[in-house]
Each structure stands twice: as structure tokens, then as C-alpha cells.
């Protein structure tokens, strides 16, 4: 039996085919436009890029470029994938916790490491996953990915810090401001250890809350000058302004009693002038660039870049305050040890 197609049915079929073809071509054109259109950040009511949200620094990239990678500023795709595989193989949830740069150097050495002296009291299970990047150092200037030489005063400060590390303190004043829960220091380079930030933004101010010791930096954007250099603060005196889509924050007037940057592989004192740049480069990424200008500690300024990732969780309370019961326990235990050794 032969079925005949009516002129109306034939016309309808041709129309459907044309519509389908048009849809495919339209989708292709839209895809091409999407691919060629650069990503644009969400904006606040005053038209500035929104930096708001909870961000974390769990980068595995070390501050300085390791000696084994001295001539390799970036890993290839294959090398990066190999590094990620090694991390999965070498570190399990039961492994001792490894913080900061320790993870990267353990992978290069191809053997586990411990961030707490193999005490077994703190495992990887309690740490967030680290993310790997092609770069082999956070430092981008100097170009070799290394910290510049320290000044004579800087070397003296480094040796003094090493000499006091691990030595029982005679009083609370001899303990670090971190142990005393006064201030942890920033930029926070100790990745994966409560390295989370919350940013809140208005047309006139930006507030950056740090998870450690729940410090909050309140940064005015109205062009006011810095306070008198006679006034020194643990968080320094910050002033911000916008350069295009980048928030620039300049901080000075740091307190002399303590290391503003927390002492993690770095040196800093009250003469530190810190310039930070915050730029949202993707929906889940905030590019954080900072330049350290501290002429009494370093022979030249240096710059590093860290990619903060948007956190899937909230910033939790850091229950730490000066006078914390742990401080009394540490000091009394040290005195008991001294008495027992006499």
C-alpha cells in the first residue's frame, strides 16, 4: 500500500526542518559568542565588582620556588596531574597533618611529613583539600620565585626568632602574640590551617574578617589620609581605593611589639608597608596580590600572588582570646618542669 504526502504535510515538514537547522545554527552562534565574551564579575549597587563572600586559601603552592624546580616557574599539565596523584597516594585521612608549604615539599621528596612532630594528635582528616596550580611559587617578584636577601637587621631578627623557638617562656610577654591570641598576622601564608576570610563591602568601606583570632580589618575607601605615625596598631592603618576593577589596600603604622606578618617564613616589623590588591577573576576565584615593602628587614620589596577560592562553607568561630586558659596552663607546666629538673 502506498501512502501519499499532501502538499500541506510536505510544507510542514520543510518548516520543521528549517526551524531545527535555525536552532542549531543559533545555538552555535550563541556558543561562539559565549566563548569569546570575557567573564564579568557580579557588581554591587554602586557598580563596583562584588568581592563579598567567604574565601579560603588552601593552595598547595609554596611561597618560594623549591630548589628542585629552580628553572621551572610553571608545571606542565602532565606534571601538575602527577603532583595531584602523588598527593592522593601519599596523604590519606589518617596521615599526620601537614600545613603550609610542608605538603608540596613532602611531595617533591616523595615521603610523608608531619606538621606537628608526628604526635598523632592531628590528622589530615581534619584539614581541607589542597588545590594545586601550575605555578611553582607564590612569589612572582623577584622573578626567581625566591625571597630577596634580608638586611643585617633582618638577619639579626631571624636568628633571634630561631633562638627563642621552642624555648619555655618565662612570662606571657615572652610568648608570641599568636599564642597570646592577640593577633595572628597577615597576609596569612599558612595555608589549610583556618585560612578563611569573609569580605563585606559597602560603597564607603570594605571589611575583611579573618578566621584566625577573628580579627576584622575595617578599610575606609573615602580617600582619608593615614593616621599619625605615632599611633601604631597590630592590624596597622589601612586605606583602600579602586583602580578599575581592582581593590587596592595600603597598610602602614604597624605595632612594634610583634611580627605583623606572623613570622611564617617571613620577616616584618613596624616599618612594613603592605600593598594588597584584590581582583575577582572568576566566579569562584579571587586573585590576591600583595607587595611587602619593609626596608629594615628586606633589601628590596617583593610580591606574591595567591588565588583564593570561594568557600562552600561558612566562617566558623575561632575561640581564642588573650587570657585564654591554655596560656596559663602552658606557663605553669613550664615552671613545673623547671622545678622538677632542679
Give each language-model segment a name:
Residues 2-342:
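PEST-like low-complexity, intrinsically disordered acidic/proline/serine-rich tracts
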Amino acid at each position: 500500500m502506498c501512502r501519499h504526502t499532501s502538499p500541506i504535510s510536505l510544507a510542514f515538514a520543510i518548516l520543521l526542518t528549517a526551524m531545527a537547522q535555525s536552532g542549531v545554527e543559533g545555538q552555535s552562534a550563541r556558543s561562539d559568542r559565549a566563548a569569546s565574551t570575557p567573564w564579568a564579575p557580579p557588581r554591587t549597587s554602586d557598580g563596583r565588582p562584588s568581592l563579598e563572600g567567604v574565601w579560603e586559601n588552601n593552595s598547595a603552592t609554596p611561597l618560594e620556588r623549591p630548589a628542585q624546580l629552580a628553572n621551572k616557574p610553571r608545571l606542565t599539565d602532565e606534571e601538575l596531574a602527577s603532583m595531584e596523584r602523588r598527593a592522593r597516594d601519599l596523604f590519606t585521612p589518617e596521615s599526620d597533618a601537614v600545613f603550609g608549604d610542608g605538603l608540596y615539599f613532602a611531595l617533591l621528596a616523595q615521603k610523608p611529613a608531619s606538621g606537628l612532630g608526628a604526635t598523632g594528635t592531628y590528622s589530615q582528616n581534619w584539614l581541607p583539600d589542597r588545590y594545586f596550580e601550575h605555578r611553582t611559587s607564590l612569589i612572582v617578584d623577584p622573578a626567581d620565585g625566591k625571597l630577596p636577601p634580608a638586611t643585617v637587621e633582618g638577619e639579626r631578627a631571624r636568628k633571634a626568632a630561631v633562638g627563642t623557638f621552642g624555648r619555655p617562656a618565662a612570662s606571657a610577654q615572652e610568648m608570641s602574640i599568636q599564642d597570646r591570641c592577640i593577633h595572628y598576622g597577615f597576609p596569612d601564608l599558612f595555608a589549610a590551617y583556618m585560612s578563611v576570610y569573609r569580605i563585606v563591602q559597602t560603597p564607603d568601606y570594605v571589611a575583611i574578617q579573618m578566621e584566625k583570632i577573628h580579627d576584622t580589618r575595617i578599610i575606609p575607601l573615602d580617600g582619608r589620609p593615614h593616621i599619625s605615625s605615632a599611633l601604631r596598631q597590630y592590624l596597622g592603618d589601612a586605606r583602600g581605593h579602586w583602580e578599575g576593577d581592582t581593590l587596592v589596600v595600603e597598610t602602614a603604622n604597624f605595632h612594634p611589639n610583634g611580627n605583623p606578618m606572623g613570622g611564617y617564613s617571613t620577616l616584618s616589623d613596624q616599618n612594613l608597608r603592605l600593598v594588597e590588591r584584590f581582583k575577582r577573576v572568576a566566579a569562584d576565584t579571587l586573585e590576591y596580590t600583595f607587595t611587602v615593602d619593609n626596608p629594615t628587614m628586606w633589601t628590596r620589596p617583593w610580591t606574591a600572588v595567591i588565588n583564593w577560592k570561594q568557600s562552600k562553607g561558612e566562617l566558623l568561630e575561632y575561640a581564642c582570646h588573650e587570657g585564654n586558659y591554655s596560656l596559663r596552663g602552658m606557663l605553669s607546666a613550664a615552671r613545673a618542669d623547671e622545678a622538677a629538673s632542679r
